[in-house]
Regions:
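Active-site and adjacent substrate-binding regions of carbohydrate-active enzymes
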Residues: 2-508
């Protein structure tokens, strides 16, 4: 591998065009490099990520690799992370043998949008990006619009870029404000926060009511965009004018429309993913984001009731196509902990065979159970759950098929199997088809009991007398008469949490 590439080296291209429904894999960069360091017997950088691992990502069918926490952080936030007793108890629960060096500080308390020197700097990232691009893998990085680390240079050079407070604010809400020493004296500055929680004490809040701050951030965004193919924007809804005013009582001009337009003016195919909550996903999509987090589907899957899931999936594709579907990420508990072994495959099939961006997290495919805080640089050793691993490998094979990457998706009605049978309400079913004539039916009994229904299929099946349903993810196989399918639908009787993804083929 060449070591001569410099920072901002353009990725070799053009990359293969993205499908309508791509897949993303989130990597906890610092934690993974710590593991590599133990293997190599030296501090690993981005240059040490083996090509074999990049090949594996390509083989698994991912389109985006999101490297979490690559930017430079500093000693101020690290000290706060190490001294905060609440956070420290969380770290101790994750790592029973916790050491000080395991706490580099939050990767979201950024002192500068340059690649951390411990990871090899900007040049190492450029070399990794080239290696990814050789495999048609796109690189996604973080952008944190809401706040900066306390020792970011802007705090000293442009204090007006941050939300200022008063002595009264500090006395009233000491959890949301702090004193900062500046060249012209001490100033009270707000911690970064959202309106529903106390401030993050390792950050300072950016002031979107200041047009100069917005302009500076757009400058950072367009510069970062030269180093990657996409950005995941942390807590993107916090800087919407209505949210910013509710949090801080300050009026601001819209940021995202001008920011996303500035990026697209230079990089038309650049991908923007918004971390979003509070039903603001559509708002952010309309302001230039390709995708927004779909926390609502996650929450409804967690609640384990099928009807609210169907209602959510009944939204128009102009909305659904631009949602990022996930079962876990660095903020949420591990899926193997949240969902029991029986429920996990059912939740995964609904999540990842729905339209949108398929968002996977490092460790999820192996059934890891311990969430790793973004303040930590090391994770616990955990065994692989071979059953979950086998399931995900089979699911990822299906997700590489053109039928579900570029095909047409539609929700299917599930009718009562007989009068008085209410268990049809426990199903989630949908279909995929494409111009080549391929058809797939996904059926999930999302309930802790057996359920029956007639799934109404959306196709004219008169071309054959009988059709075969073959489960891509299991061993089930059913032959059904076309007349019965057209008149009554496909009768299914599934055990608790049973699910399948069935390819339809003509028999005669």
């Amino acid at each position: 591998m060449s070591q001569t590439l410099t920072a901002n080296q353009p990725a070799p291209g053009p990359l293969r065009a993205l499908p309508r429904y791509p897949s993303l894999y989130q990597v906890n960069t610092r934690v993974w490099l710590t593991e590599l360091s133990r293997t190599l017997g030296k501090r690993a950088t981005l240059d040490d990520i083996p090509n074999a691992e990049l090949d594996r990502w390509q083989t698994l069918g991912f389109d985006f690799i999101w490297l979490l926490s690559v930017w430079q952080t500093g000693p101020a936030a690290q000290r706060i992370s190490r001294e905060n007793p609440h956070w420290r108890s969380e770290f101790q629960a994750t790592l029973l043998d916790l050491q000080e060096d395991d706490i580099p500080g939050s990767g979201f308390a950024i002192t500068g949008y340059t690649v951390h020197k411990n990871l090899g700097g900007d040049a190492a990232l450029a070399r990794l990006r080239q290696r990814l691009a050789q495999r048609d893998l796109r690189l996604m990085l973080d952008f944190v619009p809401n706040h900066m680390a306390p020792d970011h240079p802007w705090v000293q050079s442009h204090a007006d870029y941050f939300v200022a407070g008063t002595e009264e604010d500090l006395q009233r809400a000491p959890q949301n404000y702090t004193r900062v020493a500046l060249p012209d004296g001490e100033r009270i500055v707000a911690y970064g926060r959202d309106p529903y929680f106390s401030g993050w004490p390792d950050t300072l809040q950016l002031n979107y009511a200041n047009p100069a701050a917005q302009a500076a951030l757009i400058g950072e965004l367009t510069r970062i965009a030269t180093q990657c193919d996409g950005l995941r924007c942390d807590m993107a809804m916090l800087v919407l004018p209505e949210v910013f005013q509710r949090t801080w009582g300050l009026r601001s001009q819209p940021f995202w429309p001008q920011a996303t337009a500035a990026i697209r003016a230079q990089f038309p195919d650049f991908c923007l993913l918004a971390e979003a909550y509070w039903d603001l996903e559509w708002t952010l999509q309309q302001q230039g984001f390709d995708y927004a987090y779909d926390k609502r589907l996650y929450d409804r899957l967690h609640a384990q009731a099928a009807r609210p899931i169907r209602e959510h999936l009944s939204a128009g594709l102009e909305f659904q196509d631009h949602l990022a579907r996930f079962l876990e990420n660095h903020d949420e508990p591990r899926a193997a902990t949240t969902f029991s072994p029986e429920v996990h495959p059912a939740a995964a099939i609904i999540t990842f065979l729905a339209p949108g961006l398929r968002f996977f997290h490092q460790g999820q495919l192996e059934g890891k159970r311990k969430r790793i805080s973004p303040h930590l640089g090391r994770g616990p050793d955990e065994p692989i759950d071979t059953r979950i691993q086998a399931f995900y490998l089979r699911l990822l094979e299906l997700l590489q098929q053109p039928l579900v990457r570029d095909g047409r998706w539609q929700l299917l009605p599930c009718l009562s199997a007989w009068e008085g049978n209410w268990t049809s309400d426990c199903f989630v079913a949908f279909a995929w088809d494409d111009p080549r004539g391929e058809r797939l039916v996904v059926v999930v009994n999302y309930a802790p009991h057996a359920s029956q229904c007639n799934v109404r299929l959306p196709w004219d099946l008169s071309a054959a007398k009988h059709w075969r349903f073959t489960d891509w993810l299991g061993d089930d196989l059913y032959d059904r008469a076309a007349d019965s399918l057209s008149e009554h639908g496909w009768y299914v009787d599934l055990a608790p949490w049973q699910c399948g993804a069935y390819l339809l083929t003509q028999l005669d």
